[in-house]
Amino acid sequence: MTIAFYPGSFDPMTNGHLDVLVQALNVVPKVVVGIGIHPGKVPMFSFEERAELIATSLGEAVPLRAGDVSVIAFDGLAVDAARQHGATLLVRGLRDGSDLDYEMQLAGMNRQMAPDLQTVFLPAGTASRPITATLVRQIATMGGDVSAFVPPQVSRALKSRLKT
């Protein structure tokens, strides 16, 4: 069975992340979502909260495929985590040309470290191209409405987290 590994911080999960995840499920039977844990960063949501938001978002978007996704934490190289979970594909989403430039460099480095792991680029849908988790956090922190950019449960979690 082909397994894809989709790494990211997912802090929070956006509609763009969800779009890429659903696309990946249309290509492979199983996806492992790897939430990167970076010691130098303080996330808005804990690993457990992010994992739950991903699972809930996926369950609402594609309920029949939600069981084909597992969510794990990793704190090293994405290629190492992918291998540990039996993945042969590394999924990366692309929003625009600047993403492509960066992702091509990353794919080249990953290929050098893990020749057995193939990077697959999936384009973000038109509606989710301008969305970044960083912008979502900034807008939400300033009291803006992010409901157009994130799944409903993520929007609720942001409102709950940021209420004063």
Swiss-Prot record:
Tell me yes or no: is NADP among this UniProt entry's keywords: no
Pathway named in the protein's UniProt entry: Cofactor biosynthesis; coenzyme A biosynthesis; CoA from (R)-pantothenate: step 4/5
EC assignment: the record states: 2.7.7.3
- Print the keywords alphabetically: ATP-binding, Coenzyme A biosynthesis, Cytoplasm, Magnesium, Nucleotide-binding, Nucleotidyltransferase, Transferase
Q: Where in the cell is it found?
A: Cytoplasm
| UniProt-listed SUPFAM superfamilies | Nucleotidylyl transferase (SSF52374)
Q: Provide the site residues for: Transition state stabilizer.
A: 17
Catalysed reactions, as listed in the record:
(R)-4'-phosphopantetheine + ATP + H(+) = 3'-dephospho-CoA + diphosphate
**The protein's required cofactors:** Mg(2+)
Residues at which substrate binds: 9, 41, 78, 92
GO cellular component terms, alphabetically, are: cytoplasm
Indicate the enzyme's highest-level EC class. transferase
Family statement: Belongs to the bacterial CoaD family.
**What role is this protein assigned?**
Reversibly transfers an adenylyl group from ATP to 4'-phosphopantetheine, yielding dephospho-CoA (dPCoA) and pyrophosphate.
Subunit architecture: Homohexamer.
> Could you tell me what this protein is called?
Phosphopantetheine adenylyltransferase
What organism is recorded for this protein?
Allorhizobium ampelinum (strain ATCC BAA-846 / DSM 112012 / S4) (Agrobacterium vitis (strain S4))
